Amino acid sequence: MRLIALSLACLLPLASLPATAADASVEARLTARGLKFSIDDDGDYKVVLNFSEEGRTQLVYVSGGTEDVSGLSIREVFAPAANIKTDGVTAAMALDLLRESRTKKIGAWEIAGDYLYYVIKLPDNVDAAQLNAAIRVAGSIADDKEIELSGDSDRL
């Protein structure tokens, strides 16, 4: 019984840590481009793009962690475009999104949980200007799709 209590006591502080830790290199690159951001509970960097001409905003996230793919460190930039359930994304639309992804030079549509995201996967060694460009591309494409699917709604 003491062993169980001791084990739980040792693990308890870990429960409050985010799933992925934020990365100081991302913070430095965002700051270098003058982008304001916050860090969410998962350790991802949340940027709100302002499309002033359209009077709209768009959420874009930069993952706080990376994934290793054959020795290449990959970081994701992702922007939500729709809620699958409330915005009525159908199976036929999903096939259209796959076809549309084929036409994009960088990034593709993905579904995670109940949301449709535009996701760009980059080598983590991109500089501040390149990361900023990816953020703007993902945000613009996602916002255009949000308008297409939900009309004037600007929830994401």
Model-found features: residue ranges?
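N-terminal secretory signal peptides
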Residues: T20-S70
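C-terminal partner/receptor-binding element of secreted or periplasmic proteins
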Residues: Y118-L156
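N-terminal signal peptide c-region/cleavage motif recognized by signal peptidases
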Residues: P13-P18
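Bacterial N-terminal signal peptides that target proteins for export
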Residues: M1-S7
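A mature extracytoplasmic/lumenal domain signature
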Residues: D41-G43, F51, G64-T66, F78-A81, ...
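Short, internal acidic amphipathic alpha-helical interface segments
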Residues: S73-Y115
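Extracytoplasmic/secreted envelope proteins and their assembly/folding machinery
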Residues: D23, E27-L30, A91-L95, A128, ...
